[in-house]
UniProtKB/Swiss-Prot annotation:
This is Autophagy-related protein 19. Residues 157-187 form a coiled coil. The lineage of its organism: Eukaryota, Fungi, Dikarya, Ascomycota, Saccharomycotina. Polyubiquitinated at Lys-213 and Lys-216. Deubiquitination by UBP3 is required for full activity of ATG19. It is a peripheral membrane protein. Keywords: Autophagy, Coiled coil, Isopeptide bond, Membrane, Phosphoprotein, Protein transport, Transport, Ubl conjugation. Residues 406-415 are annotated as: ATG8-binding. Disulfide bonds: none annotated.
Length: 415
């Protein structure tokens, strides 16, 4: 083990071993440093490889692989240098004819190197044994390679696709260049001449066409006319689109009333009147509002209830209980909710169903509705006095008859 490590250190200090193949020879090189220019110079020093930097491509592979990669730029050389630094044996092949001779496949830098099959390994060993005897330069020069010697080189599918993409781009560029040359070099086969008599009273036309002296000026007029036609068509199309949008907007249905309503469910039991309020609007119902309930009997009674400082959020419930209340509920009773400014912001009537939808009255101004729906931010919980479990939030309500001065005090509590 110590001897092998010592040999590796000696090889690294002396250089990096590299096997070089051409169509007739095999050479063992020691590259002193990992530099592309120095490696090319070392390969070019061989008498039979003096054209390796010129007309022939260089390919490389780790030993015992069946495909090779081309050496074109620093990126490709960098991959080769990583293998050499790891003390892996690598080979360099010169020219496509050498690849055909050794039956090697060209791959891109994104493909993996493929291992040799057992049959290919035997053939590789036989070829290496055959190359142990040096071949004279004359023998190599006598073998001429036909122009189609690289026609049977195997190329990977990905590499072939890249070649096809480059060929398509080249074809498009050539077609575009040819079309531009035809347009610039096009000459009219014949000239059209003629005269148009313009009446003298059309002074604007006379002055306009008098200024046209060259064919270029006439082409400019023609081009401007076509630009005007194109812009006119675009404006017409935009006008049609705008009209279509306006038609669609007229067909938009108005939101159903239930989307802007307060839902109140009423229930009467145990000499008490229960109100369950659900905020089904799109805004928060502010605090400090009042609920007015008016009977529909012969002698209507109006109850004014302070709803307290708490706001009611969107899609939130709140329940109230008012007692004592011994009257019977009749259809036609009115429920109103007033804001802190005394304006009615929601209105509805009690019918056969216990659920009532309160909606904003049509006479209510937008400013009043907005002011009533502003959230009550000045209220703070920490300002309330501490209460025990038996405490009840209550206030007084007035019960009055129309035309009668008698009043009866009621109380309410909030659950």
């Amino acid at each position: 083990m110590n001897n092998s490590k010592t040999n590796q250190q000696m090889n690294t200090s002396m250089g990096y071993p590299l096997t070089v193949y051409d169509e007739c020879n095999k050479f063992q090189l020691i590259v002193p440093t990992l530099d592309a220019n120095i490696m090319l110079w070392c390969i070019g020093q061989l008498s039979l490889l003096n054209d390796s930097n010129g007309c022939k491509h260089l390919f490389w592979q780790p030993n015992d692989k069946s495909n090779v990669r081309i050496l074109l730029n620093n990126y490709d050389y960098g991959h080769l240098f990583k293998y050499l630094q790891c003390q892996r044996k690598c080979s360099v092949y010169i020219g496509e004819g050498t690849l055909k001779k050794y039956n090697l496949t060209i791959s891109t830098s994104f493909d993996n190197f493929l291992d040799l099959t057992p049959s290919e390994e035997k053939e590789s060993l036989c070829r290496e044994d055959a190359h142990e005897d040096p071949v004279s330069p004359k023998a190599g020069s006598e073998e001429e390679i036909s122009p189609n010697s690289t026609s049977n080189v195997v190329v990977s599918r990905e590499c072939l696709d890249n070649f096809m993409k480059q060929l398509l781009k080249l074809e498009e560029s050539l077609n575009k260049l040819e079309l531009e040359q035809k347009v610039t070099n096009k000459e009219p086969n014949h000239r059209i001449s003629g005269t148009i008599d313009i009446p003298e009273d059309r002074s604007e036309l006379v002055n306009f066409f008098t200024e046209l002296k060259t064919v270029k000026q006439l082409e400019d007029v023609f081009q401007r006319y076509h630009d005007y036609e194109r812009l006119s068509q675009e404006c017409d199309s935009k006008t049609e689109i705008a009209s279509d949008h306006s038609k669609k907007e007229t067909k938009i249905e108005v939101e159903p009333p239930n989307e802007r309503s307060l839902q109140i469910t009423m229930d009467q039991r145990d000499n008490s009147l229960y109100f369950q309020l659900f905020n089904n609007t799109n805004s928060v119902l502010a605090g400090n509002c009042k609920l007015k309930f008016t009977d529909a009997g012969d002698k209507p009674t109006t109850q004014i209830i302070d709803m307290g400082p708490h706001e009611i959020g969107i899609k939130e419930y709140k329940e109230y209980r008012y007692f004592p209340y011994a009257l019977d509920l009749e259809a036609g009773s009115t429920i109103e909710i007033e804001n802190q400014y005394g304006e009615v912001i929601f209105l509805g009537k009690y019918g056969s169903s216990p659920m009532i939808n309160l909606r904003p009255p049509s006479r209510l101004s937008a400013e009043s509705l907005q002011a009533s729906q502003e959230p009550f931010y000045s209220f703070q919980i920490d300002t309330l006095p501490e209460l025990d479990d038996s405490s009840i939030i209550s206030t007084s309500i007035s019960l009055s008859y129309d035309g009668d001065d008698n009043e009866k005090a009621l109380t309410w509590e909030e659950l």
